């Protein structure tokens, strides 16, 4: 066991393996991608549209025709429009202006001019990897999509189940698909163009320029054994590709058909092999000739066009242009760098075989040849190689592609997604540029800025940020939730999968996920397996493929060289886990070692190992790597543990876990909520709002500038609100005089303690039943936790109101509110806005506001009253901002934005007031608590601490958990954590137990027993077989319980599902406009729906009158409910209910369908439904 320093805290670690690689920057996936977009992506898009040429100016022909060419040279990014905090407060978008240098040339004169033009302001990423859009913090989630390229798969035909169809799919980034098909049952080749009808493959070959039939057959040679009688007999009728010479005489010429006699002669001779055309190729050619006769390229084009567009008249030029535009022109078809790279990689093996078999090159010469055309479109050779490779696939289906392999998927990160959007927006602007260029006659009259339509570009990008499913409102419950959101991968969204159609195989864990995507962290429900998280060390290469690091192993010795491999590259190597035994020089000690090879696990000799994992936490995500003893938890519960840590509310007094994994420090660091020193120095001044550090050099001497010491000031965030209404509050953890190094943590943020992530509290728990109060995972809680404010959290809500211009005059924010008591105005200042520090409850006025009502002519008397009493005399409506039902708290901040001072408040808004109310929420019955192992429960009872079970030394336990929550859930990690947590408390140590390399039971229990014995707490346990159990006594009676009980410290978190936020009651409230039924939901102050099943319940009990009331006067009988109200006020009997409004709505809807609906009473008299 060794001591490791995590931030400002030292921990004893049980980890035996030293990580070969430090945890990388966990949000670099966002930051690097966006940076690349600004530096390279912008100019790449502009260069794609460059040059833009004008149409010739149709002027006086004598003066010569004018033409201009516009090119984009470079781009430049300006400074952000406002600080991040200001954008959040004022509801602005945090943007940067983008400029481009444009070169415009007059084609006739060669005259040239360069000018800088403004392209628009685009949302800019903050240093934490987020965007501020209209004041709200958002994240662009990375998308996992099928990589373009060529895929070899099999399809089972609908007609027969016996022989599959082998398909080569060419998948572009943009453009039509091309599918080459080999029907093994018919032994025929076909092609399917743009997912339409299939055509003969060789028809496509003819169009591609293979004019001679024999030339096509040459591409599919099939050497056969000339000594084998059976083979030669079957080969009769085959077309021979090479002359067969016997005793200087040609028996069969090239292109001839092998006869029975020739076959017999060859058998009797010493000829070893005969090269014939592959039967599938011969049959395909014969079928083409049978169907179309002699085919040249023109005829091929026409026939293909006829199949693809049956309604149109086929002309050679049209047909040729159409096919060329589909696959061989960059205008309508694009493979992209990734697609070309994937095709080249996939077809290299086929290319080598082509060179050897068709071109006759020697094997050793071919082995090192790579297939590397650089065309952004398909080439004839791609199609030839793919169709040849189909024959190999049919013989060896193992070499087929699986769609779910990560080598066939790539990640579209922020930069690429914005680049695609920018490209779409600029394509629209480009057409306008072209049109506007034609309007100018000379170069000096052209204003480049006026050519570019900035609005089109900005609108496109803003729409993406505001409405795309990949632009998401950031989860900010705690720092981990934010970090995980930035590292999320989604397979759904534009260009991705549909949630409803996603098969089980897509969602499942695949062996290629190892070290790239977490197999544990994914939502429960409809999105399971579609939304995942990046593994801790995963990286993204230049093509967007996920890579993971490995240590290179040479001759059984582990080197320090780190290699990043994609899922495809990894397939060819034996990779050992990092838990194998090695000595201090890196030599592997065991002769045979377990390794991963493709999807298999096998044992190999140590000198056959090529790579080794870099860390035990390599396969999991950040959230999952925070679970101690993960190796003892069932995957389903670990999934819940990972997800629930993201829902933990930051507490008033954060406390790091006694039992950690060592990742807490990195998670807190990259979440962006802790403050790091940028330079080394000495702390000069500290208070709650700022830290001042005097900068020092390596020798410890102050750094001077103009003879004065350089001071670095770090401002802290105090009680800021997050997207989910939790609190961000930073606290300094350094003192005056402390020496700090660059990179040290100097201030904690929310849910961090001494630089480590601290999502919950260490509490003393006992696993035992207690009077049924822990039935169904409920939790019994000691009042001590309330007294100590253990699980108290602060939540900040913002309430805002606008004073707008209305048709009847402007709204006014004022303290003069009609019909309101002085008591209700006690917390408002002279402007009608609540004062900071006031305690407010439900329905209290936060901002007084009046709206003008419609009014007729005013009499002279009214004018006098107005002049005397001011606004009070005016006919106005009270539209004040009030605190909603069920909330209370203290006003901690008020922000007022006035139209005169602010330019961007929006049209018709004169004033905007935001009131921030902080609410302190202590633990209550109904709150949800959870550990890190998926062990969740609801507080069922809060018991006085004197009634709680207590230890032999009198210490009462703080939580009582159900022991039945462990065996069937198979999350035994919580029991080991309980033991180690108690050991931490007794020894005053902080422990780290890394995932898959943690403490063993025999390391904890004997040590725990020794420590307990030292303080007299060994009762209930024995020396020879320590169990970690202790005798507890009942707090109410003082008697000991029958059996010893597992007691210890567990790290528990309070989740964001707080009972106080969910509880809701309605007396009288709003009704829906059309149906006149009460609204639903807490937000609308709605009622509880009395649904179908509830009606059945009342029917079953014969409660007819109650049911009648429920469906009429308590719901949508307008007249009836008003009458009942009057009757109750006057103390009269309740009248009979009338007709529900929903019945009238139904009749009106049926009449809207042109049905004549009439209502009659029991005597057959027609009733006018509108008058009843």
Curated annotation (Swiss-Prot):
Any single GO CC term annotated in Swiss-Prot or TrEMBL for this entry: DNA-directed RNA polymerase complex
Instruction: Note whether Nucleotidyltransferase occurs among the keywords.
Output: yes
**Name of the protein in question:** DNA-directed RNA polymerase subunit beta
Under the subunit heading, UniProt states: The RNAP catalytic core consists of 2 alpha, 1 beta, 1 beta' and 1 omega subunit. When a sigma factor is associated with the core the holoenzyme is formed, which can initiate transcription.
Q: Species name for this entry?
A: Pseudothermotoga lettingae (strain ATCC BAA-301 / DSM 14385 / NBRC 107922 / TMO) (Thermotoga lettingae)
* UniProt-listed CDD domains: RNA_pol_B_RPB2
Q: Which reaction does it catalyse?
A: RNA(n) + a ribonucleoside 5'-triphosphate = RNA(n+1) + diphosphate
Gene (UniProt): rpoB
Q: Report the family membership.
A: Belongs to the RNA polymerase beta chain family.
Q: Which GO terms describe its biological process?
A: DNA-templated transcription
Top-level EC class as recorded in UniProt:
transferase
Instruction: Briefly state the protein's biological role.
Output: DNA-dependent RNA polymerase catalyzes the transcription of DNA into RNA using the four ribonucleoside triphosphates as substrates.
């Amino acid at each position: 066991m060794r001591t490791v320093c995590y931030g400002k805290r030292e921990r004893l670690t049980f980890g035996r393996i030293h990580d070969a690689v430090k945890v990388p920057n966990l949000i670099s996936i966002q930051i690097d991608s966006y940076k690349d977009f600004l530096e390279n992506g912008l100019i790449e898009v502009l260069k794609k549209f460059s040059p833009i040429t004008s149409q010739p100016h149709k002027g006086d022909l004598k003066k010569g025709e004018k033409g201009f060419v516009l090119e984009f040279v470079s781009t430049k990014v300006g400074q952000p429009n406002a600080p991040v905090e200001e954008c959040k407060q004022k509801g602005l978008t945090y943007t940067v202006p983008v400029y481009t240098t444009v070169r415009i040339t007059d084609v006739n004169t060669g005259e040239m001019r360069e000018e800088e033009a403004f392209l628009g302001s685009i949302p800019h990423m903050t240093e934490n990897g987020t965007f501020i859009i209209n004041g709200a913090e958002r994240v662009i989630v990375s998308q996992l999509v099928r990589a373009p390229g060529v895929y070899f798969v099999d399809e089972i035909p609908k007609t027969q189940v016996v022989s599959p169809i082998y398909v080569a799919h060419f998948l572009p980034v943009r453009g039509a698909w091309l599918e080459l098909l080999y029907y093994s049952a018919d032994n025929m080749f076909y092609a399917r163009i743009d997912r339409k009808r299939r055509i003969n493959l060789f028809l496509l070959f003819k169009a591609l320029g293979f004019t001679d039939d024999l030339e096509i057959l040459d591409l599919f040679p099939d050497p056969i054994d000339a000594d084998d009688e059976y083979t030669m007999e079957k080969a009769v009728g085959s077309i021979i590709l090479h002359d067969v010479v016997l005793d200087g005489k040609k028996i069969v010429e090239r292109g001839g058909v092998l006869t029975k006699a020739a076959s017999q002669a060859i058998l009797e001779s010493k000829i070893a092999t005969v090269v014939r055309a592959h039967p599938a190729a011969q049959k395909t050619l014969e079928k083409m000739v049978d169907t179309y006769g002699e085919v040249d390229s023109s005829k091929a084009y026409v026939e293909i066009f006829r199949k693809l567009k049956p309604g149109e008249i086929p002309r050679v030029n049209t047909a040729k242009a159409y096919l060329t535009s589909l696959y061989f022109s960059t205008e309508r078809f694009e493979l992209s760098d990734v697609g070309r790279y994937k095709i080249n990689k996939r077809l290299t093996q086929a290319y080598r075989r082509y060179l050897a078999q068709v071109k006759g090159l020697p094997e050793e010469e071919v082995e090192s040849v790579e297939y590397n055309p650089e065309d952004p479109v398909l080439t004839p050779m791609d199609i030839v190689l793919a169709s040849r490779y189909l024959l190999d696939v049919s013989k060896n289906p193992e070499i087929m592609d699986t769609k779910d392999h990560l080598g066939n998927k790539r990640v579209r990160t922020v930069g690429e997604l914005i680049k695609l959007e920018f490209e779409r927006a600029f394509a629209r602007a480009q057409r306008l540029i072209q049109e506007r260029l034609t309007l100018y006659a000379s170069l000096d009259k052209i204003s480049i800025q006026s050519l570019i339509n900035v609005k089109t570009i900005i609108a496109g990008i803003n729409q993406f940020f505001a409405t795309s499913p990949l632009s998401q409102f950031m989860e900010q419950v705690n720092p981990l939730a934010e970090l995980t959101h930035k590292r999320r991968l989604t397979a759904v969204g534009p260009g991705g999968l549909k949630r409803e159609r996603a098969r089980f195989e897509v969602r499942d864990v695949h062996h290629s996920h190892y070290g790239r995507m977490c197999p544990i962290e994914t939502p429960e429900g409809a999105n399971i397996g579609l939304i995942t998280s990046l593994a801790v060390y995963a990286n993204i290469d230049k093509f967007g493929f996920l890579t993971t690091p490995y240590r290179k192993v040479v001759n059984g010795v582990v080197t320090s060289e780190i290699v990043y491999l994609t899922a495809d590259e990894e397939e060819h190597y034996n990779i050992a886990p990092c838990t194998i035994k090695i000595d201090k020089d890196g030599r592997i000690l065991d002769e045979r070692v377990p390794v991963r090879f493709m999807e298999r696990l096998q044992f190999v000799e140590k000198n056959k190992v090529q790579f080794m994992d870099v860390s035990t936490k390599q396969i999991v995500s950040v959230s999952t790597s925070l679970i101690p003893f993960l190796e003892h938890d069932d995957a389903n519960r670990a999934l819940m543990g990972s997800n629930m840590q993201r829902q933990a509310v930051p507490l008033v007094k954060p406390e790091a876990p006694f039992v950690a994994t060592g990742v807490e420090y990195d998670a807190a660091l990259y979440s962006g909520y802790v403050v790091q020193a940028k330079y080394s120095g000495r702390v000069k001044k500290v208070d709650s709002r700022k830290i001042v550090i005097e900068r020092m050099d390596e020798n410890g001497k102050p750094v001077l500038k103009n003879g004065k010491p350089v001071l670095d000031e770090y401002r802290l965030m105090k009680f800021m609100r997050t997207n989910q209404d939790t609190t961000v509050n930073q606290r300094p953890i350094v003192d005056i005089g402390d020496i700090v190094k660059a990179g040290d943590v100097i201030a904690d943020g929310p849910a961090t303690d001494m630089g480590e992530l601290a999502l919950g509290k260490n509490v003393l728990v006992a696993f035992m039943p207690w009077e049924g109060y822990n039935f169904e995972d409920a939790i019994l809680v000691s009042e001590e936790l309330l007294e100590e404010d253990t699980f108290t959290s602060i939540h900040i809500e913002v309430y805002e109101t606008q004073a707008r211009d209305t048709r009847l005059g402007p709204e006014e924010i004022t303290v003069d509110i009609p019909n309101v008591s002085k008591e209700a105005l006690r917390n408002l200042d002279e402007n009608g806005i609540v004062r900071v520090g006031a305690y407010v409850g439900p329905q209290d006025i936060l901002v007084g506001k009046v709206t003008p009502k419609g009014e007729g002519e005013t009499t002279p008397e009214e004018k006098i009253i107005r002049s005397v009493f001011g606004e009070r005399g005016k006919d106005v409506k009270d539209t004040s901002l009030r605190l909603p039902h069920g909330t209370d708290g203290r006003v901690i901040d008020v922000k007022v934005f006035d139209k005169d001072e602010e330019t961007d408040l929006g049209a018709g808004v004169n004033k905007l007031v935001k009131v921030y109310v902080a609410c302190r929420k202590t633990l209550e019955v109904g709150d949800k608590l959870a550990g890190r192992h998926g062990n969740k429960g609801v507080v069922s009872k809060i018991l006085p601490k004197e009634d709680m079970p207590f230890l032999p030394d009198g210490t009462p336990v703080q939580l009582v958990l159900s022991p039945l929550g462990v065996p069937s859930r198979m999350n035994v990690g919580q029991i080991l954590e309980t033991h180690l947590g108690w050991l931490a408390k007794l020894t005053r140590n902080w422990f780290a137990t890394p995932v898959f390399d943690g403490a063993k039971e025999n390391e904890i229990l004997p040590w725990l027993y020794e420590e307990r014995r030292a303080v007299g707490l060994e009762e209930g346990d024995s020396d020879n077989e320590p169990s970690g159990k202790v005798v507890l006594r009942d707090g109410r009676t003082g008697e000991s319980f029958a059996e010893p009980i597992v007691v210890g410290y567990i790290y528990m978190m309070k989740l964001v599902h707080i009972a106080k936020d969910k509880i809701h009651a309605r007396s009288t409230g709003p009704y829906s406009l059309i149906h006149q039924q009460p609204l639903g939901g807490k937000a609308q102050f709605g009622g509880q729906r009395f649904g179908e099943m509830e009606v059945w319940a009342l029917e079953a009990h014969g409660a007819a009158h109650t049911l009648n009331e429920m469906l009429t006067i308590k719901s949508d009988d307008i007249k009836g409910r008003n009458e009942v109200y009057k009757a109750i006020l006057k103390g009269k009997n309740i009248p009979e209910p009338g007709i529900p409004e929903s019945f009238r709505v139904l009749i009106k809807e049926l009449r809207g369908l042109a049905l004549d609906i009439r209502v009659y009473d029991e005597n057959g008299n027609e009733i006018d439904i509108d008058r009843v």
